[in-house]
């Protein structure tokens, strides 16, 4: 009889890798799915849902991400400060031009599980608007995504 083995947290931390993703001309949703899978560790053979076994992901050129269709014009993103009249509305064009890092972070966060691990998983995501990032010392593996 074959027994399944569960991944231990210490082993998962020791096996973590760094990946670099260039978001130039990639569709937001398709990029977010791949990034969320890597952050959770679903690309690994020993995936365990209750252990944070995912890798680190650095996303560069976030201001060059693409929204398909009319989403840049018609879709809005909302923030509320929890004060009266504190609702902020931002269009897709504004989110891409000014807050592209927050746009990708929100999209990936929505694809993560809604439990205690979500914050730990999201802390392994680093997003930069241009191609300069301070993670050269980690020697990230360049991940080529063919998503169009």
Swiss-Prot record:
GO terms for molecular function: mRNA binding; structural constituent of ribosome. GO terms for biological process: negative regulation of translation; translation. Pfam families: Ribosomal_L13. GO terms for cellular component: cytosolic large ribosomal subunit. Keywords: Ribonucleoprotein, Ribosomal protein. PANTHER family: LARGE RIBOSOMAL SUBUNIT PROTEIN UL13M, RIBOSOMAL PROTEIN L13. HAMAP family: Ribosomal_uL13. Part of the 50S ribosomal subunit. This protein is one of the early assembly proteins of the 50S ribosomal subunit, although it is not seen to bind rRNA by itself. It is important during the early stages of 50S assembly. This is Large ribosomal subunit protein uL13. It comes from Ureaplasma parvum serovar 3 (strain ATCC 700970).
